[in-house]
Design a protein with these regions (language model features):
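A ubiquitous short alpha-helical element
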Residues: 1-5, 51-55, 461-464
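Hydrophobic alpha-helical membrane-insertion signals
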Residues: 1-31
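A general alpha-helix detector
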Residues: 19, 63-69, 106
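Anion-binding and metal-coordination hotspots
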Residues: 68, 76-89, 100-524
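General structural signal for alpha-helix termini and helix-helix connectors
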Residues: 51, 70-73, 93, 113
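Basic, short loop/linker segments at the boundary and entry of helix-turn-helix/winged-helix-like folds
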Residues: 26-66, 72
């Protein structure tokens, strides 16, 4: 008979950990992070927490704030469930939370209800602490923008112009209906006013008045097979239908506002834009946000979330935000050709900023010699002693009129000149396209600005700044998107998206700060 024996010994002894940091390396990111955050008064951002007199004790809000920021520092973007799971199994998060494990709902409440109002101030204070330690140069700001796809359905667009066209077609239907009603009421002496446009309030008032005139009761209305609606019922139901449609159109136009032409039904703050990475393969517009950053010494000094498709419209809000944070404007804002507009150059002149933003034709102007020296361009026409512009054939150009540029904040005007006589000109084929005398549009002020920008950017300093911008500003988005895997907005609504982008930017800056500190230690 086989003898069966059991071994009850356990070679693994129970170990009581005294301090979690004993298990962490001395250069561990969480220790660098904790020492740095200990120098900042975090409690002043947590004063708005409502007090509860019943229930379990609240989690330490300072520890929760540190845990959230550290999650964004290490992961680039961290979800609420990842935070909860990390507090259970990750020593770094256990160290920050002191072995407590808040649920993902608790983290969500903390971020949305407590951090949303103070995140911008927290971003500013952490940045200023980093910049003070790193002696960051804020006079040179490298600017870039990138479009991040919103968390919205792809085919959920609402177009402002299409809505306006539908509204005008509805106005025509309302006019026809009022004409029928007035014909119906011609013997009563009552008449509804007919306009080219109608407001929902007027339509609502007209419907109420129509009910009062005919003493209509909706409970007596008929519907379905075998029933014939009265004229009054049909007119009243049409009024109600048109009122509902008009309210819908008005709401859509109000959501779009003056600054954009579209929005998404599933995220009203998202605007449809063309994104560089067309993964759908059909050149389709996608709901997105335009995220702008100003980078100084590899740190994100200022960040802004916009609903504008063009980067030109984002420059002035970004500079004003920088001024609100630091109390001054950067001396050298360096940006690519998407930012070089008349409005932005005038803003720089008024606020003491140097013009280091390219304009749209900068590359062609500086690299294509044939284009730059082309004699038939209006900017290359000679000016005679009387100040008159003359073409290569010696013909003078006379000022016809001045035209205001649409949507220009500083009253920019274009001057329209026409040649005195182009008949029989040997250069006509190269100089003009039409049959009449050549007409040119000139803005001398903008031309001088372009020459100043070329002079700035073609200098040795300008070349170094351009190179640095491509490394730092574009490199920042490269790190965020490809190294730290934050490629798409998760939250919905402009305020929530701004909160999310601030957290990602804070995580990036803390991540950079830790890496630089480690490089200094390894060099020593």
């Amino acid at each position: 008979m086989k003898k069966i024996t059991h071994t009850y010994s356990n070679p693994k002894q129970a170990v009581l950990p005294i301090l979690i940091q004993d298990y962490l390396d001395i250069c561990d990111p969480v220790l660098t992070f904790d020492r740095f955050m200990g120098e900042i008064d975090l409690e002043k951002y947590l004063k708005e927490i409502p007090k509860h007199e019943v229930g379990r004790l609240r989690y330490n809000p300072v520890s929760m704030l540190k845990t959230i920021l550290f999650g964004f520092m290490t992961n680039g973007y961290v979800s609420l469930r990842e935070l909860e799971d990390s507090c259970k199994v990750n020593l770094r998060f256990m160290y920050l939370m002191d072995h407590e494990v808040p649920s993902y709902r608790t983290f969500g409440y903390f971020i949305n209800e407590i951090l949303s109002d103070s995140i911008e101030k927290l971003f500013c204070d952490i940045n200023q602490k980093i910049f003070e330690k790193e002696h960051t140069d804020l006079q040179h700001l490298y600017i870039d923008g990138s479009k991040f796809e919103a968390n919205a359905n792809k085919y959920s667009w609402v177009w402002k112009k299409a809505t306006e066209k539908s509204r005008y077609r509805l106005f025509e239907k309302i006019t026809s209906l009022f004409q029928e009603i007035n014909l119906e009421l011609q013997y009563t002496g009552i008449k509804f006013r007919i306009n080219t446009e109608y407001s929902p309030e007027y339509l609502k008032e007209a419907a109420s008045k129509y009910v009062e005139i005919w003493q209509l009761d909706e409970a007596t209305f008929v519907a379905g097979k075998g029933h014939r609606k009265s004229v009054q019922q049909r007119h009243y139901e049409k009024l109600k239908e048109y009122l509902s449609k008009l309210n819908e159109y008005v709401e859509k136009i109000q959501i779009c506002g003056d600054g954009r032409n579209s929005y998404s039904k599933t995220d009203h703050s998202a605007t449809f834009m063309r994104i560089k990475k067309d993964y759908m393969g059909n050149d389709q517009l996608l709901p997105a946000y335009n995220v702008q950053v100003g980078v100084a010494d590899e740190y994100i000094a200022v960040v802004d979330v916009n609903q504008y498709r063009s980067d030109m419209d984002c420059f002035i809000p970004l500079m004003n935000k920088f001024h609100d944070i630091y109390g001054f404007y950067p001396k050298y804002p360096v940006a690519d050709a998407d930012y070089g507009s008349y409005n932005n150059y005038i803003f720089c002149e008024q606020n003491g900023l140097e013009k280091y933003m390219k304009f749209p034709m900068f590359k062609k102007e500086t690299t294509d010699r044939n284009y730059h020296e082309y004699p038939f361009r209006a900017v290359n026409f000679k000016i005679d002693g009387d100040g008159k512009m003359r073409c290569p054939n010696g013909k003078g150009f006379h000022l016809q009129y001045r035209k205001a540029i649409k949507e220009n904040a500083y009253g920019r005007e274009e001057e329209i000149y026409q040649c005195e006589d182009c008949s029989g000109c040997p250069y006509a084929e190269k100089c003009k396209k039409g049959e009449g005398n050549r007409t040119v549009r000139v803005n001398q002020e903008l031309t001088k600005m372009h020459q100043e920008v070329i002079q700035n950017l073609e200098s040795i300093q300008g070349a170094l700044l351009r190179m640095n911008r491509s490394i730092q500003a574009e490199g920042t988005f490269g790190i965020i998107k490809n190294d730290r895997w934050y490629k798409r907005i998760v939250r919905r609504g402009i305020k929530s998206v701004q909160l999310e982008v601030y957290l990602v930017s804070l995580g990036h800056n803390l991540y950079k700060f830790h890496n630089k500190q480690m490089k200094i230690k390894s060099a020593a």
